[in-house]
């Protein structure tokens, strides 16, 4: 699809897992489900394999302003060309993955053992920095303290989806005219400005896993929690520890001062693992 918008009054409370994606195809054991065109539904009787195909050079964006929750142990996955979540995502004892896929790729989300992994195989070569034409991307994490973090001057308070599929944050300025400024978030950007929880309060076992991934990862006024009665879970922002290949690494990662991240052991066990990573630039102002 060209894009997915989940509005502020939407509430999804599901017993199973949920995947929201702008992929062109979702792989099953015996075939693919295609977003457009004809499908052979008899081949889709088995479970999805976790493989998504993005064949569009500019995959559609996802904006979530609502609340999505699933049953304990299930998963919530949001994958698109750019992903913005200002609502609530909840998967107790399970996993939440929010990932931006900037170009034509095949994506496979797996959980070997107890660790989440995400593989991205480009369908066509990705342009290098010297040849890329990423004109929609007008925000870098170094700009965000003045653009997104609430201050006496301005703060981002609404979202809009442009005709080209890009997403804009709209900030009200404090001048007399109360003019608006828009900051475009292009392909490969993941923005979280809501809550994501995978806590485990029901048993003495560890919590679940959270992964926020993309070429540019932005957390502003966000709350991420992977705490559990028997131990904390894993939170990966921008990639894995030391850029390990199990997760794609961001080029730039920004975490605002009003973002809170926790992976606590509530009654027993060890605290969890929190990784904030970028290959090029990481700016971290929040609390862990």
Where are the regions that the model predicts?
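Extracellular and secretory-pathway beta-repeat/beta-biased strand scaffolds
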Residues: 1-288
